């Protein structure tokens, strides 16, 4: 619209179109205000009039939308449309103010830079609410309606006056006063919990805040470190504390944004295994990244994907984490790249997995004699290792013990990569000059040092007329028997991967030294595939395997005299070999003392109680006399019945005899004194009231009862106890009846059985009744069935 102010003169317009000269003034409200013109909404009639800013009598800067004005109406000379002229701003009427209490529902936006700017003369609005008679009413307001330099926030408590625009009828809030700021709620994650208090890592700033358990609104038993919470901050004794702590759904609080893209870099500083006392940096590690502008990113001990040791120079892949609170960037999800060993200065070694335990294992090294300890956490690429897997690793000193090494950064290799020896197919013959020994077998734990190191043996051999010697290890011996000094052996020569070292491998025993000493002993124990021999001095037992016995093993019995040689097997354990049965008499004097003594077993043989250390049993004389209380040892030879199982506390009778090469006086011809009653007899077996070990009853088979007597419950018997060496269970043998027990009297049939049928009543008279036709007779006077059972043809009736 174009407008010429010069058209407004006495001849250019009049008050109304009818030409009346009286100038009537009207009132209205500024509805729209632009740079040079605006529009007025008339109060007395439905009309919207144009006005030019030059027609305003006053400072145009004070005029704003919503102001009441008084004006005259004229007409545009060119268009004939009514326009407002001679505008005067009307002072607002003073009304009695009723102030209301309410709160901010939606605050006026503080920053409108990102939004389209408001039109000139228009202000952004917010909303408030108040309650009256149980109803809630909402009003708009602008920042100009707020008293004082106060920035209102949603939730603030306020006091205001309700303003009713008489021209537009719009209701709004004005003269707004702030009563109480809303308490801010903060979020965070519980990072530590003590006995009565804890700490929360705040989500708005990089800081921890204290809270007492009494401030937690919920079940304290469910609160754990890592839970998301919200809280209010209050000042107590000059320190900020968290109050009104409440749980939030898991995942509500997010501290950082992790990049989707992966980056690669080089480790320039590793995290020390043992942090120094003055180290305060929570992210001590550094990774150099080759961006357009190279930069170093920090990382902490929780930023690696695995617990594999990082070394300086490692090539790694990672994500970048950006903290939302302070925009700090760090490397996270760090994993070692497979080609990293091309860039580090570490010396890599190879070996084979030799043993696996719970969380750790041992590697048999190519370049070292000792097995190398390792933790499962040091396995690269998340591979699952098994015994005999070939691996590559780095050896570093243990941080806790400088004398020990362990393997780190273990990488699985393809089968066939690792080779310990390169040996020829040629076999050599030689004689053992020094025996090889194993290390102490109790060194499987990584926390225990070795008590005794393994020692190499020496073999003398002849090569093209030249007498030479070569070392061999006990682990390279084939079979279960270790060669001894003077034994003939066959072996191969192997070059180790360590240069200049040769060792005998695949050592096989060909023959024992013919001059080796032969020993005598007595069979003390027989198991499934092995046994024990009592030495000639009757004070020890020697292990032997049935494969070392020359003859039929089934012919061996307890107490048999045998001849054998001693050898050292794996683990430096002594065992008997070349065991032969012999009938020579050795070790027992011609005459035993004829006096028979009564005694009590105070310690059984080790075969009866494997938990005891000593092999020999001990018997104490209990009969009155000068020898009462004296104690004598005994072995398997001293038993009258070699299969008898003497237990601690049993009464025995015995003689004394000088036995063994050291002429020791021992108990001999020992016979137990056992009496007990028969508990019950079944078909082919029974039980005796006699306690053996954990069992209260002793089993016996009827074939063990002497003279073919049929035992009855209550009979008193004498017997021997034998121990089944294979099953470990005891049973009675050689059972003699000493006296007969009381006869069992047949009890009459109970009346309840005789009268049962008589007591049956049936309420239904038509129901079938059971009637006794004849009384049954006993088997001695039985009539039985008169009709003989015959084979009948189906379908044919006689």
UniProtKB/Swiss-Prot annotation:
Keyword set, alphabetical order: Acetylation, Cytoplasm, Isopeptide bond, Phosphoprotein, Repeat, RNA-binding, Ubl conjugation
Q: Which residues carry this modification: Phosphothreonine?
A: 761
**What positions are modified (Phosphoserine)?**
123, 276, 514, 584
How it assembles, according to the record, is: Component of a multi subunit autoregulatory ribonucleoprotein complex (ARC), at least composed of IGF2BP1, PABPC1 and CSDE1. Interacts with STRAP. Part of a complex associated with the FOS mCRD domain and consisting of PABPC1, PAIP1, HNRPD and SYNCRIP. The interaction with PABPC1 is direct and RNA-independent. Interacts with EIF4ENIF1/4E-T.
Subcellular location as annotated = Cytoplasm; Cytoplasm, Stress granule; Cytoplasm, P-body
Q: Give the protein's biological function.
A: RNA-binding protein involved in translationally coupled mRNA turnover. Implicated with other RNA-binding proteins in the cytoplasmic deadenylation/translational and decay interplay of the FOS mRNA mediated by the major coding-region determinant of instability (mCRD) domain. Required for efficient formation of stress granules.
* Gene, per the UniProt record: Csde1
- Where exactly is the Glycyl lysine isopeptide (Lys-Gly) (interchain with G-Cter in SUMO2) cross-link placed along the chain? 91
UniProt domain CSD: residue ranges: 26-87, 136-179, 186-245, 297-337, 349-410, 447-507, 519-579, 610-670, 674-735
Q: Which residues are recorded with the post-translational modification N6-acetyllysine?
A: 81
Q: Which InterPro entries match?
A: CSD, CSD_CS, CSDE1, CSP_DNA-bd, NA-bd_OB-fold, SUZ-C
What are the annotated GO cellular component locations? CRD-mediated mRNA stability complex; cytoplasmic stress granule; cytosol; mCRD-mediated mRNA stability complex; P-body
Limits of the SUZ-C domain: 748-789
| Source organism superkingdom | Eukaryota
A GO molecular function annotation here is: RNA stem-loop binding
Q: Does the keyword Translocase apply?
A: no
The protein's name in its UniProt record: Cold shock domain-containing protein E1
Please give the organism.
Rattus norvegicus
Name the family the entry cites. Answer: Belongs to the UNR family.
Cross-referenced SMART domains: CSP (SM00357)
Q: Name one GO biological process term.
A: CRD-mediated mRNA stabilization
User: What is the first-listed, main subcellular location in coarse terms?
Assistant: cytoplasm
């Amino acid at each position: 619209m174009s407008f010429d102010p010069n058209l407004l003169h006495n001849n250019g317009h009049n008050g109304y179109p009818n030409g009346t000269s009286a100038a009537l003034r009207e009132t209205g409200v500024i509805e729209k205000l632009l740079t040079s013109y605006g529009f007025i909404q008339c109060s007395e009639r439905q009309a919207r009039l144009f006005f030019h800013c030059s027609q305003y009598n006053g400072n145009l800067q004070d005029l704003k939308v919503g102001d009441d004005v008084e004006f005259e109406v004229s007409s545009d000379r060119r268009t004939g449309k009514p326009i407002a002229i001679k505008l005067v701003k009307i002072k607002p009427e003073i009304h009695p103010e009723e102030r209301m209490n309410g709160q901010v529902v939606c605050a006026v936006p503080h920053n409108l830079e990102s939004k389209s700017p408001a039109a000139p003369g228009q202000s952004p609005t917010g909303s408030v609410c108040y309650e009256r008679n149980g109803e809630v009413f909402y009003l708009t307001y602008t920042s100009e309606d707020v008293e004082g330099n106060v920035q209102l926030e949603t939730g603030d408590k306020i006091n205001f006056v309700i303003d009713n625009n008489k021209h537009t009828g719009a209701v709004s809030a004005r003269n707004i006063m702030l009563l109480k700021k809303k308490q801010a709620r903060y979020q965070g994650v519980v990072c530590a919990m003590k006995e009565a208090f804890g700490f929360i890592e705040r989500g708005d700033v990089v800081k921890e805040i204290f809270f007492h358990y009494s401030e937690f609104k919920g079940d304290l038993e469910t609160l754990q470190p890592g839970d998301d919470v919200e809280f209010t901050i209050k000042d107590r004794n000059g320190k900020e504390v968290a109050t009104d702590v409440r749980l939030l759904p898991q995942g509500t609080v997010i501290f950082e944004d992790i990049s989707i893209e992966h980056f690669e870099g080089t480790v320039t500083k590793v995290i020390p295994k043992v942090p120094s006392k003055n180290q305060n940096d929570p992210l001590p590690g550094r990774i150099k990244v080759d961006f357009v502008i190279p930069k170093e990113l920090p990382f902490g001990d929780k930023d690696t994907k695995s617990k594999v040791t990082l070394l300086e120079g490692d090539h790694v892949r990672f994500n970048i984490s950006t903290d939302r609170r302070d925009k700090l960037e760090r490397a996270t999800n760090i994993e070692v790249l497979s080609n990293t060993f091309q860039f580090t200065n570490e010396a890599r070694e190879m070996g084979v997995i030799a043993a696996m335990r719970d969380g750790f294992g041992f590697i048999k090294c190519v370049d070292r004699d000792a097995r190398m300890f390792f933790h499962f956490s040091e396995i690269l690429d998340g591979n699952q290792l098994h015994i005999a897997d070939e691996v590559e690793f780095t050896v570093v000193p243990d941080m806790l013990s400088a004398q020990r090494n362990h393997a780190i950064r273990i990488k699985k290799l393809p089968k066939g990569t690792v080779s310990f020896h390169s040996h020829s197919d040629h076999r050599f013959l030689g004689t053992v000059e020094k025996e090889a020994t194993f290390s102490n077998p109790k060194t499987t734990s990584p926390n225990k040092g070795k008590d005794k190191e393994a020692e190499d043996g020496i073999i003398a051999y002849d090569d093209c007329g030249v007498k030479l010697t070569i070392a061999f290890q006990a682990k390279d011996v084939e079979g279960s028997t270790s060669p001894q000094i003077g034994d003939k052996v066959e072996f191969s020569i192997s070059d180790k991967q360590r240069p200049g070292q040769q060792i005998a491998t695949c050592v096989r025993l060909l023959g024992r030294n013919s001059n080796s000493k032969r020993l005598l002993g007595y069979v003390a124990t027989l198991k499934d595939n092995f046994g024990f021999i009592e030495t000639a001095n009757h004070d020890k037992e020697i292990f032997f395997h049935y494969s070392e016995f020359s003859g039929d093993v089934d012919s061996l019995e307890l107490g048999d005299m045998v001849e054998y040689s001693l050898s050292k097997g794996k683990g430096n354990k002594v065992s008997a070999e070349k065991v032969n049965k012999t009938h020579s008499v050795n070790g027992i004097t011609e005459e035993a003392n004829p006096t028979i003594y009564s005694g009590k077993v105070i310690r059984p043989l080790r075969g009866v109680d494997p938990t005891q250390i000593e092999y020999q049993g001990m018997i104490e004389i209990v009969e009155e006399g000068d020898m009462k209380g004296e104690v004598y040892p005994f072995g398997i030879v001293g038993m009258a019945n070699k299969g008898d199982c003497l237990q601690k506390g049993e009464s025995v009778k015995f003689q004394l005899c000088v036995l063994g090469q050291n002429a020791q006086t021992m108990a001999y011809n020992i016979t137990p004194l056992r009496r007990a009653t028969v508990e019950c007899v079944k078909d082919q077996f029974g039980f005796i009231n006699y306690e053996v070990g954990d069992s209260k009853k002793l089993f016996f088979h009827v074939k063990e009862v002497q003279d073919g007597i049929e035992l009855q419950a209550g009979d008193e018997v004498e017997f021997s106890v034998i121990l089944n060496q294979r099953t470990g269970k005891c049973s009675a043998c050689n059972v003699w009846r000493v006296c007969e027990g009381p006869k069992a009297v047949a009890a009459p049939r109970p009346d309840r059985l005789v009268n049962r049928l008589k007591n049956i009543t049936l309420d239904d008279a038509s129901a079938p009744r059971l009637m006794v036709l004849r009384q049954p007779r006993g088997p001695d006077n039985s009539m039985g069935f008169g009709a003989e059972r015959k084979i009948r043809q189906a379908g044919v009736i006689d």
